[in-house]
Curated annotation (Swiss-Prot):
This is Putative membrane protein insertion efficiency factor. It comes from the Bacteria. The lineage of its organism: Bacteria, Pseudomonadati, Campylobacterota, Epsilonproteobacteria, Campylobacterales. It is a peripheral membrane protein. It is found in: Cell inner membrane. Belongs to the UPF0161 family. One of its GO terms (cellular component) is plasma membrane. Could be involved in insertion of integral membrane proteins into the membrane.
Amino acid sequence: MRNNKTPFLSAIFTASIRGYQRFFSAFTFSSCRFYPTCSNYALWLLCFESPLVAMGKIAIRILSCNPFCSGGIAYPTTRLKRPSLLQSHKDFNRNFKTITFWLVPTTKSRATYYIIKV
């Protein structure tokens, strides 16, 4: 479920986060209070949300990463339409791609899912 609304902006943000992971984060000790790390959280959100919504959620996540927060496991969430499970066997085999993410429904709403990378 790639975000195709603004692929250019998503590509710029994704490239900058990958650059941060490769060149800056690789030379510092691992000190993230959350799982997934803030940079992985950002990459996962950019796959499912529009870049502006993703940047808002990423900013909240980065602001919550401070000494006064206990951290823990905090998966990103997204709102999606429930996928149709009524597909023929032929369509499923033809359209099947490698599973990259699990979308686990939250208890808040049927349209809100946790994004978990496989």
